[in-house]
Amino acid sequence: MMEAVHFGAGNIGRGFIGETLAANGFKINFVDVNETIINALNQRGEYTITLAAPGEKKIHVDNVDGLNNAKDPEAVVKAIAQADLVTTAIGPKILPIIAPLIAQGLQARDAANNHQALDVIACENMIGGSQSLKKSVYEHLDDAGKTFADTYVGFPNAAVDRIVPQQKHDDPLAVSVEDFKEWVVDESQMKNKDLKLKTVDYVPDLEPYIERKLFSVNTGHATTAYTGKYLGYTTIGDAIKDPKVFNQAKGALAETRSLLLSEFKNFDEKDLENYQNRVLQRFQNPYISDDISRVARTPIRKLGYDERFIRPIRELKERGLNYSVLMDTVGMMFHYVEPNDAEAVKLQAMLKDQPLVDVIKEVTGLKDAGLIDEVEASVKSKDR
């Protein structure tokens, strides 16, 4: 039986990546610091996924165990040394933290003369996740280790898409996910091209798919969340029923669609519109009760220069295309208040202590004076 090491035993790890690996016949070693989940995985060796869709179908996942990387890093190194595949779903900020452990695992492979090609795939909500992880891993390898990794280890970037809502269960391993899923891997960066997973798409150029997902799902979801919060809603399901929120999301996606069509000639306009309409339908799924606080969390990161709003705004402006709905949404983001979100608290503190223009420059990284003025006007237009 093939073995996978998967970093991140959270809802996405178990409810999406784990499901896919299990369906492809892998034994899965989940790596996490959450003792409750790791212990439950080891005690039971299985868990159940519920699809948030009519019929609420159950999917059984077995041949799983858990490794606590804080308490037993040696076991993780040993698992990587003999793994057929390594994946992550832990969040972009945690990738550099697991890099030393992956580096040790690769060194252990080298020491064991394991020359089987290995791919390390970061399944994160970011552009270039695997290559970013590679950079961090290589910081912990000596020249011989880098040579080994260059020869036998691939870090193919991936785009992943599945809504896994905030949820609470008595069973720590139970997880509910939407029935839609998409996992796309950049085949050109793979080392083990013989290992292809069913239900995963392999493409020669990932960029169009990553941008399509980022500027449709991520931009659309965040637009729904920040507009909904501004209008007083607490869940995505309730917010999107309001025509103001729905039209804001639809308008934002129309703007990002014009950008995608101008940037990538392989997209068909009707197909892209259908894809984005499906995205909006997913947000309306009555089986998913997603809190706005989850979707809108980390507003400072989401206002970043290369993130889901500022980047399309910049690129639309460069092309002379409309970005008014995106800009309007950015104005609402600066008014996002959520006491349990450290970044939201920090953003409001910055706005209280510094001139608005300085905060805009710091948070968005914008240098374009015209765009900075537009953001300022948008924020002020949302004052109450």
UniProtKB/Swiss-Prot annotation:
Biological process (GO), any one: mannitol catabolic process
GO cellular component entries: cytosol
Domain of life: Bacteria
MF annotations from Gene Ontology: mannitol-1-phosphate 5-dehydrogenase activity
Keyword Transcription listed: no
Keyword terms, alphabetized: NAD, Oxidoreductase
EC number(s) from the headed UniProt entry: 1.1.1.17
Matching HAMAP family: Mannitol_dehydrog (MF_00196)
Family to which the UniProt record says this protein belongs: Belongs to the mannitol dehydrogenase family.
Protein name: Mannitol-1-phosphate 5-dehydrogenase
Species of origin: Lacticaseibacillus paracasei (strain ATCC 334 / BCRC 17002 / CCUG 31169 / CIP 107868 / KCTC 3260 / NRRL B-441)
Encoding gene per record: mtlD
